[in-house]
Amino acid sequence: MKILHIIGTRPQIIKLASVLNHKDSFFEHSIIDTNQHYEDSMQKNLYEDFGIDLSTIKFLDSNKFLSSDIASMFNLLSQELNQIKPDIVFIYGDTNTTVAGALSAKLNNIPSVHIEAGLRSYLQMQIEETNRIIADELCDYLFCPTETAVSNLRKEKLDHKAFLVGDITLDIFLNTKPQKPSLINSDFFDKQYYLSTIHRKENLNNHSKLENILESLSTLSRVVLPIHHSLKNKLIEISLYERIPKNIELIEPLPYSEMLFLIKNSMGVLTDSGGLQKDSFWLEKPTLTIRENTEWRETIESGQNILINEFPVNLIDKFN
């Protein structure tokens, strides 16, 4: 059986790596990367971290479409599907790549699997929420990470194609040893720090909110911020890049194993990332999530993850 995996972002590479760890000789795997995260430092670090040979991946030409352009991605993916002729397509998560992959499979009459199906934040204005709903409607098999996800699909009358398979990123987490970042000086860890990531459009496109988030980060003694290309571009665009509080240390995005090391050795995490919420939860780190709601309800119910969406605020009080 020929399986085609369609991915395009860092979190999707992590999910893909988990699936590829369970390779079977019965399956032939092909990979297409849409280049939705187009920075070499972001993509190649992760592929190399998981031992995935870059020569086995078909990278779409990101010059032919905007990173947010589902229609152009769909057209390019449809061309690739006609050449590869897979028996089934695997799509992952909740990005524009997810929707483009699901749509191209559907309109080319190829069965598809949505991994991480059934997750819901119930924030209808959130792009990722729309992507999840569309993908679950389009795909033939819905692989759910939690019982809550299955329950969500039951409410939408989609449970007839839902399967509770567990969280595949937990497999990767358990099998990845945190590694001390190779490009960071040894004295970096002499002082305590909080870890933060910001990349969601609802936070980046609200300029006053973004400025207030940075102001709130200044209430912490020291913050390490791996800077996503979209955040850097936005900060430059709105003239905030040169005014970042001095207690915030910007670093390049890291491979997954090194990111786990940063989380493990931090005082706490402030993020809008779904994946980082879970990694922090598994590493038992106090977490503040910059959202109105989260699809990972279990982290909230545990009391370890707290939603925070009004800024500025004294984050020391929130972490305590």
Q: Where do the language-model regions lie?
A:
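Donor-nucleotide binding loops and adjacent catalytic segments primarily
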Residues: Q36-E39, K44-Y47, Q179-N265
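Short acidic-hydrophobic, aromatic-tinged amphipathic segments that line or gate anion-handling sites
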Residues: I57-L60, C144, L164, E249-E252, ...
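N-terminal glycine-rich anion-binding loop in soluble enzyme alpha/beta folds
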Residues: D24-S55
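A nucleotide-sugar donor-handling region in carbohydrate enzymes
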Residues: H37-S41, L60, L138-L204, K209
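A donor-sugar binding/catalytic signature common to diverse glycosyltransferases
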Residues: I91-Y92, H114-I115, L142, L260-T299
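Active-site and donor-binding regions of nucleotide-sugar-utilizing enzymes
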Residues: L4-I7, I13-H22, F26, L46, ...
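Structural motif
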Residues: K2, D87-I88, Y193, M267-G268
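Leloir-type glycosyltransferase catalytic cores
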Residues: Y47, T148, I306-N320
